Structures are given as structure tokens and as C-alpha cells.
């Protein structure tokens, strides 16, 4: 099969190449993509050439030309002779690149796929793998029901962190971002309150709303190292801070006694790949990758996990470079971007 695949050729340059995919081997599944979704943080880091993995010699796949994307939905068209449980015509979610078709090797980290509920459309399902990174805030927090939660940074990962916390029963849930459109999207999804940090000290605004000394749970989804101490300041004494956005770099200053130790905060990381760990480990509690993705698909299908206000652009593959420019420079217009292949 001939497939079209988006590649970041080098920093700030995106192209489309055609690749011949062979028939599936015995442990492979061929999927035709209907929709793929853009993970702004990861893809912009590669597009700008700043992603740290591009410079890691132990990760040879992370180099230019690089095929971006890790969240897609489509239809199985062929299965290898050794595959059971899958058949042509199955509608699936999978960690796919931005490509018109993909050959998945079962057993490989990116060779996983999950069946879609009958009432879930491809566009919504295309976001499920990205949503897992936001779900990490609720998973790492453990108890969420009835706990106050603030989400700092309302890009695509922050939106999913906020929406998953709402679905998990946190209350009240507060979104914090300087971009009005992002705050409105959070409100559309059910946020109890939103805060504009450019209008005044975010900590004071949060405490005024809660009537307490901070939130019991804070999710930092900014991807900015210096925002982690800010997130810590938003938490109440004894609260939890979960870092769900990838903070590439070093924070300028953290006073570990005053900001962390004396306040007995718990600060944890929640990269989505933690769910590849066995379910019994303390990292994910009762969760693993398959349970998380099935929950997300079911929650999307039922409406428990809202996509209200999230998708702002539906584009052709040829328009991905322009979308990257918009995500970088027009944050008041761009939030969720999906690529339509059919």
C-alpha cells in the first residue's frame, strides 16, 4: 500500500513523503488513518529543533527527518497470520503518526491499538492517546473525589488534565491561563472557575476564590520549568503538585525548604509513558496503558470526558506547517488541531 506521511525534515520545515507499506507480516496490523491529532508540546519541540531527545544518541529514531504525531484513529484493513482478536473493518485508536496508513507491529510500544465504541467518531477518538498525558494528573493524585484542583496552563495537555479531573470528581476545578480562548474552553468543559494570571497574582486570585490557603491538588501543564515553583505556590500546605507538561530545561530558583520541605508538599511527575509500567507499581496504581486508553475511549463516547471548545482547527495534511506556526504564535486562535486524511 502507498501511504502519505508527514515528516519534519529539519527545524521549521515540514513536508510530505510517499512510502510503500508492505503486506503485514504475521505480527503486524495495517491500519488506514481517518484522523490524526496534533500534540502541540511534543511536536512544536521537534519542529523548533529544541526537543532534548533529538540530541540523545541513545534514541536513534529521534532525528530529522522525523515523522511527528502519536495519536490517531482509523480502520484495520489487513492483519498478519499470527494476529488474533483483530479483523479488517475494526475501528481503532492507536499511537499513530500523521500518515494516511500505518503498519503496527504488535508487541512494540507503538504497536498497540484499541477498539472504538460504536458511537464514538474518528475525530474524537483521534485525541485519545494525547488525552492520556492529561489523565496522568488524576492517576498520580490518587484520591480526587471532592478535592479542590487547579490546572496551570490550558493548552491541549492542560485541557485534558482539567477535563479528566472533572470526570474523576475533583471539586472545585479551576483553570489558570493568560489566554482568554483557553479559559473559555475550560469553562465550556465544566471548569468551576478560571483565572487570568495576567490580571493579577494567580495565587491571590486562587486563594480568594477557594477561601483557603491553596488547592489540594495542582497540575502543572505549562511545560515551562520556572512554572513548577509557581505551581507549588498554588498548592495548600500538604497538597499535591503533579507535573503533566514536559518542562524542558532547568528552573532558575527553587527554595526547597520554604517552598517544599516546610510545607510538606508532594511533587510528582506524570509523563504519559508511566502507564507502560506494570499495573501493580506505585507509579500508576491500578492503571496500565490498556485500562487508561479503554477508559478514555469510553469516557469520550459517553460524554463524561468533554471535548467542548477543544478542537479549533481541522486541517489537511499539507497545512500542518501552518498549523505549527499558529500553535506557536497565535495562542488566542489555536488550541486543538486535527488532521483529516479521509
Locations of the language-model features?
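C-terminal capping/lid region of NAD(P)-dependent oxidoreductase domains
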Residues: 212, 242, 249, 253, ...
Amino acid at each position: 500500500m502507498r501511504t502519505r506521511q508527514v515528516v519534519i525534515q529539519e527545524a521549521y520545515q515540514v513536508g510530505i513523503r510517499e512510502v510503500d507499506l508492505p503486506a503485514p507480516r504475521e505480527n503486524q496490523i495495517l491500519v488506514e488513518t481517518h484522523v490524526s491529532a496534533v500534540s502541540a508540546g511534543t511536536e512544536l519541540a521537534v519542529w523548533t529543533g529544541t526537543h532534548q531527545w533529538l540530541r540523545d544518541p541513545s534514541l536513534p529514531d529521534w532525528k530529522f527527518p522525523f515523522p511527528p504525531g502519536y495519536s490517531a484513529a482509523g480502520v484495520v484493513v489487513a492483519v498478519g497470520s499470527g494476529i488474533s482478536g483483530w479483523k479488517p473493518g475494526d475501528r481503532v485508536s492507536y499511537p499513530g503518526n500523521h500518515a494516511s496508513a500505518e503498519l503496527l507491529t504488535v508487541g512494540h510500544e507503538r504497536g498497540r491499538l484499541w477498539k472504538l465504541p460504536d458511537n464514538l467518531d474518528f475525530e474524537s477518538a483521534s485525541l485519545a492517546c494525547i488525552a492520556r498525558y492529561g489523565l496522568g494528573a488524576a492517576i498520580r493524585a490518587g484520591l480526587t473525589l471532592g478535592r479542590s484542583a487547579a490546572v496551570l496552563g490550558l493548552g491541549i495537555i492542560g485541557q485534558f488534565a482539567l477535563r479528566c479531573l472533572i470526570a474523576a470528581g475533583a471539586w472545585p476545578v479551576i483553570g489558570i491561563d493568560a489566554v482568554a480562548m483557553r479559559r473559555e474552553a475550560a469553562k465550556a468543559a465544566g471548569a468551576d472557575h478560571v483565572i487570568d494570571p495576567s490580571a493579577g497574582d494567580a495565587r491571590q486570585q486562587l486563594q480568594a476564590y477557594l477561601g483557603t490557603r491553596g488547592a489540594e491538588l495542582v497540575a502543572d501543564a505549562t511545560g515551562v520549568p520556572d512554572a513548577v515553583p509557581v505551581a507549588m505556590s498554588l498548592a495548600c500546605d500538604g497538597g499535591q503538585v503533579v507535573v503533566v507538561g514536559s518542562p524542558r530545561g532547568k528552573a532558575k530558583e527553587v527554595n526547597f525548604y520554604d517552598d517544599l520541605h516546610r510545607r510538606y508538599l508532594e511533587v510528582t511527575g506524570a509523563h504519559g509513558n508511566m502507564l507502560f509500567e506494570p499495573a501493580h507499581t506505585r507509579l500508576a496504581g491500578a492503571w496500565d496503558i490498556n485500562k487508561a486508553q479503554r477508559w478514555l475511549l469510553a469516557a469520550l463516547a459517553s460524554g463524561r470526558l468533554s471535548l467542548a471548545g477543544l478542537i479549533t482547527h481541522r486541517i489537511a495534511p499539507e497545512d500542518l506547517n501552518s498549523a505549527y506556526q499558529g500553535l506557536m504564535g497565535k495562542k488566542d486562535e489555536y488550541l486543538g488541531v486535527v488532521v483529516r486524511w479521509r
